[in-house]
């Protein structure tokens, strides 16, 4: 029987404990495991290489994304770095979105400057620019859809097909939607990665990442390198992640519903100069999103019509929205891209990506939607007092 996403998320790892019959899998905190005899190791020998708790959550994540296997890492950034370590060598080209997450941009840019590989940042929604970049014969193509922070949507299937034509490996960062709303492997990607810190865990108490591959041989190679460079995830984080994963689908449904109400509210506000959400017909890639996603997601961003003082007054008027980086938790967060999530990008790079100095990003939580809108109303009231 093919299981639905909600069932996979809830049931993963349940009733697997044969020793005591625990319904919920236990946390295996041991760093090392004894051998049964000389040259007779067990399934696990050292927790950096393998851990029973990590095994359970890796199987769950692989099943949710439809992959052959998954490798859990200690951060989302280490998941990205793991992929580039495996697939790129000095001289190889990486093609990445020009408006990608600021941490990814900083990593690629800094390692390219050290000669680890070459990187080309391109607007992947511009087919001419994308084809020109692919003509340079990249080894790896990273796709981020929807993008961070402008929620631009690109055609994953098309980009992965074009990448395959030039012999490139395609990897999709699916952090913004989670497997509950989008499955890149089914759209043709070779790999999918997540910052598990975000929606997969959903409670802002874990830092972790994951890479999931279609090919079991690639999973084996990723796991070997993750152990080799020491970026595998820990047992306690694995346990918390598995616990959070069980409520992924209902959390996404409620957060998405709140986001849609907030988008509708923001459309009525004179201080909102631009609004970005895939549900909006004017949003770049709206029609693609309607086709390749199972929902429009709970992330949105908007530009305030004003200056830094307007921003300060607006943010100061909020009490429910927490001013913080990250996203995907049950609580609603708001962040200022230029000084927070994308501070690692040079001002000219932010400008080229369309990230303005008054852009705010919202990660919608699962609080009461009317309370969230009332809080935004307080923010706009404060902003207008200047």
UniProtKB/Swiss-Prot annotation:
Keyword hit for Repeat: no
Residues annotated with N6-(pyridoxal phosphate)lysine modification: 198
GO biological process, one term: transsulfuration
UniProtKB keywords: Amino-acid biosynthesis, Cytoplasm, Methionine biosynthesis, Pyridoxal phosphate, Transferase
Involved pathway(s): Amino-acid biosynthesis; L-methionine biosynthesis via de novo pathway; L-cystathionine from O-succinyl-L-homoserine: step 1/1
PANTHER family: CYSTATHIONINE GAMMA-SYNTHASE (PTHR11808:SF75), TRANS-SULFURATION ENZYME FAMILY MEMBER (PTHR11808)
Function: Catalyzes the formation of L-cystathionine from O-succinyl-L-homoserine (OSHS) and L-cysteine, via a gamma-replacement reaction. In the absence of thiol, catalyzes gamma-elimination to form 2-oxobutanoate, succinate and ammonia.
Protein name (database record): Cystathionine gamma-synthase
Organism from which the protein derives: Escherichia coli (strain K12)
């Amino acid at each position: 029987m093919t299981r639905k996403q909600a069932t996979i998320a809830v049931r993963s790892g349940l009733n697997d404990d044969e020793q005591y019959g625990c319904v919920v899998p236990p946390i295996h905190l041991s760093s090392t495991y004894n051998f049964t005899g000389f040259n007779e190791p067990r399934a696990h020998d050292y927790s950096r290489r393998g851990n029973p708790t990590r095994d359970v959550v890796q199987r769950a994540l692989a099943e949710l994304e439809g992959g052959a296997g998954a490798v859990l890492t200690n951060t989302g950034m280490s998941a990205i770095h793991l992929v580039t370590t495996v697939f790129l060598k000095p001289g190889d080209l990486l093609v990445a979105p020009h408006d990608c997450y600021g941490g990814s941009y900083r990593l690629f840019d800094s390692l390219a400057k050290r000669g680890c590989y070459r990187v080309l940042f391109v607007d992947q929604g511009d087919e001419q620019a994308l084809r020109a970049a692919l003509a340079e014969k990249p080894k790896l193509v990273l796709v981020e859809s929807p993008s961070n922070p402008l929620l631009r949507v690109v055609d994953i299937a098309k980009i992965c097909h074009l990448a395959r034509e030039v012999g490139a490996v395609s990897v999709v960062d699916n952090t913004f939607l989670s497997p509950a709303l989008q499955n890149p492997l089914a759209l043709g990607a070779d790999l999918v990665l997540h910052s598990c810190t975000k929606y997969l865990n959903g409670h802002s108490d874990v830092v972790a990442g994951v890479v999931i591959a279609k090919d079991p041989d690639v999973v084996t190679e990723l796991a070997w390198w993750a152990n080799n460079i020491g970026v595998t995830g820990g047992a306690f984080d694995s346990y918390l992640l598995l616990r959070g994963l069980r409520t992924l689908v209902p959390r996404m449904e409620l957060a998405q519903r709140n986001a849609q109400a907030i988008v509708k509210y923001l459309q009525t506000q004179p201080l909102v100069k631009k609004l970005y959400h895939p549900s909006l017909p004017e949003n770049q890639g709206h029609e693609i999103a309607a086709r390749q996603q199972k929902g429009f997601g709970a992330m949105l961003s908007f530009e305030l019509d004003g200056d830094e003082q307007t921003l300060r007054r607006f943010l100061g008027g909020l009490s429910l929205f927490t001013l913080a980086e990250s996203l995907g938790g049950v609580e609603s967060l708001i962040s200022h891209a230029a000084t927070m999530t994308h501070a690692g990008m040079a001002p000219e790079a932010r400008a080229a990506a369309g990230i303005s100095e008054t852009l705010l990003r919202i990660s919608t939580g699962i609080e009461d939607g009317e309370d969230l809108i009332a809080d935004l109303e307080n923010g706009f009231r404060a902003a207008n007092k200047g």
